[in-house]
């Protein structure tokens, strides 16, 4: 079995969610509606990688995605990328797939990656 991790930019994501491959996947890394919303996000640049999906043959076995955003900063505005989804098939959790996906995410957005946990905000409020 061959594993492949595919990254999707804005344009590639649009093609992907309209593809026959997307329609026949056993599981999808993003819904059509969310993919279309990502494509139309005004903060999304053409070269932003929005999603990394891991496939073994034609089966989805993991994915990680981001949501581009703009926040206020000392110098005006700063472009950031929110971690928006992260999943690995249970049978692949003993391997290093989660680490591989997270590494690609950090490598791409190390200075602009934001992660939040609203449950922790309620606990420590």
Predicted features along the sequence, with ranges:
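Short, flexible loop/turn elements at secondary-structure junctions
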Residues: 9, 56, 68-70, 85-90
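Short amphipathic alpha-helical segments, especially helix-boundary/capping motifs
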Residues: 9-16, 62, 78, 97-102
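A short linear-motif detector with a strong N-terminal bias
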Residues: 29-33, 45, 61-66, 90-94
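Acyl-donor binding region in acyl/amide transferases
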Residues: 74-125
């Amino acid at each position: 079995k061959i594993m492949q991790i595919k990254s999707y930019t804005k344009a590639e994501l649009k093609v992907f969610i309209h593809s026959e491959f997307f329609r026949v996947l056993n599981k999808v890394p993003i819904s059509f509606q969310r993919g279309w919303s990502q494509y139309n996000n005004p903060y999304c640049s053409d070269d932003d990688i929005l999603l990394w999906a891991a496939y073994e043959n034609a089966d989805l076995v993991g994915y990680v995605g981001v949501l581009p955003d703009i926040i206020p900063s000392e110098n005006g505005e700063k472009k950031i990328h929110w971690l928006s989804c992260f999943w690995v098939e249970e049978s692949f959790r003993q391997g290093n797939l989660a680490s591989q996906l997270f590494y690609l995410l950090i490598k791409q957005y190390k200075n602009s990656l934001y992660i939040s946990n609203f449950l922790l905000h309620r606990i420590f409020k």
